[in-house]
């Protein structure tokens, strides 16, 4: 039995949906446009923006790559965001983080129009999300839920344990599992008896950024194991789960790379295709 939950495979299907949708739009004389803002020249952010651009272009989405000097003032960055908010041709805005230290990240992200906030960064977007109102879904948590559903893994009534309580993954994922009627426990650095808690999980999600932290002693026989973490070890991308050690014990498991991360950018671009939700 193949135990691998492949984000790459699921992403291929979603890309096909996006491509068909944008082709229909263009046939009617319409198009979608995303503006991606990069401040400075952080290597990881440059790579990610280029990857976004390539994927968007392949899927028929117009992509505006905005590169701003690292020394730009906070006021001028805010003016740029306000300009994009008012531009009716722009359907989605992405602001790559982190920002330079002299810029107040919270003040800037809160300026992004919630109806264009593809990454769900602003407090208005976050508020809509937690109140269950219509909004763009946070992409990494959405990737976890999308992957489970694509493989017809039952969530309702299941015991879910999430290791990690970040604002980007752990907290919104907790809410999304609640919305699916799971019983959810969130663990963190102060959790006592972590192994015992993890062993209760039907679905174990790990998002802490510590390479190979979770071994088979944390996993109950037959659990579904979702690895969200990415770290570089000896030049290779590695997850939070010791894949080789856990594989035999899990019923299904995500690889790193090739699992959750393979879906995130695709779902980010799907966000702008509102009719596909």
Swiss-Prot record:
Catalyzes the oxidation of 5,10-methylenetetrahydrofolate to 5,10-methenyltetrahydrofolate and then the hydrolysis of 5,10-methenyltetrahydrofolate to 10-formyltetrahydrofolate. Gene3D superfamilies: Leucine Dehydrogenase, chain A, domain 1, NAD(P)-binding Rossmann-like Domain. Keywords: Amino-acid biosynthesis, Histidine biosynthesis, Hydrolase, Methionine biosynthesis, Multifunctional enzyme, NADP, One-carbon metabolism, Oxidoreductase, Purine biosynthesis. It comes from the Bacteria. GO terms for biological process: L-histidine biosynthetic process; methionine biosynthetic process; purine nucleotide biosynthetic process; tetrahydrofolate interconversion. NADP(+) binds at residues 164-166, 189, 230. SUPFAM superfamilies: Aminoacid dehydrogenase-like, N-terminal domain, NAD(P)-binding Rossmann-fold domains. This is Bifunctional protein FolD. HAMAP family: THF_DHG_CYH. GO terms for cellular component: cytosol. The keyword Membrane does not apply. InterPro entries: Aminoacid_DH-like_N_sf, NAD(P)-bd_dom_sf, THF_DH/CycHdrlase, THF_DH/CycHdrlase_cat_dom, THF_DH/CycHdrlase_NAD-bd_dom. Homodimer. Its EC number is 1.5.1.5, 3.5.4.9. Belongs to the tetrahydrofolate dehydrogenase/cyclohydrolase family. GO terms for molecular function: methenyltetrahydrofolate cyclohydrolase activity; methylenetetrahydrofolate dehydrogenase (NADP+) activity. It catalyses: (6R)-5,10-methylene-5,6,7,8-tetrahydrofolate + NADP(+) = (6R)-5,10-methenyltetrahydrofolate + NADPH; (6R)-5,10-methenyltetrahydrofolate + H2O = (6R)-10-formyltetrahydrofolate + H(+). Pathway: One-carbon metabolism; tetrahydrofolate interconversion.
């Amino acid at each position: 039995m193949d135990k691998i939950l492949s984000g790459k495979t699921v992403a291929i299907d979603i890309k096909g949906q996006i491509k068909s949708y944008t082709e229909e739009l263009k046939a009617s004389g319409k198009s979608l446009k995303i503006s991606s803002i990069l401040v400075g020249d952080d290597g990881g952010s440059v790579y990610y923006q280029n990857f976004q651009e390539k994927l968007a272009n392949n899927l028929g989405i117009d992509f505006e790559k905005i590169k701003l000097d690292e020394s730009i003032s906070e006021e001028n960055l805010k003016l740029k965001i306000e300009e994009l908010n008012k531009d009716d041709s722009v359907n989605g805005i992405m602001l790559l983080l982190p920002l330079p230290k002299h810029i107040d990240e919270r003040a800037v992200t809160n300026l992004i129009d919630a109806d264009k906030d593809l990454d769900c960064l602003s407090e208005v977007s976050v508020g809509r999300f937690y109140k269950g109102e219509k909004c763009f879904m946070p992409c990494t948590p959405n990737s976890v839920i999308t992957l489970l559903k694509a493989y017809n893994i039952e969530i309702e009534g299941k015991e879910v344990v999430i290791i990690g309580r970040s604002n980007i993954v752990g907290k919104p994922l907790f809410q999304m599992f609640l919305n699916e009627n799971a019983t959810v426990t969130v663990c963190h650095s102060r959790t006592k008896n972590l192994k015992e808690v993890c062993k209760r999980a039907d679905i174990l999600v790990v998002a802490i950024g510590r390479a190979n932290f979770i071994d088979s002693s944390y996993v109950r026989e037959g659990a579904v194991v979702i690895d969200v973490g990415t770290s570089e070890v000896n030049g290779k991308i590695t997850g939070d789960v010791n894949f080789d050690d856990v594989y035999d014990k899990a019923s299904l498991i995500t690889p790193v790379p090739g699992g959750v991360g393979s879906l995130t950018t695709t779902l980010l671009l799907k966000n702008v295709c509102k009719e596909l939700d």
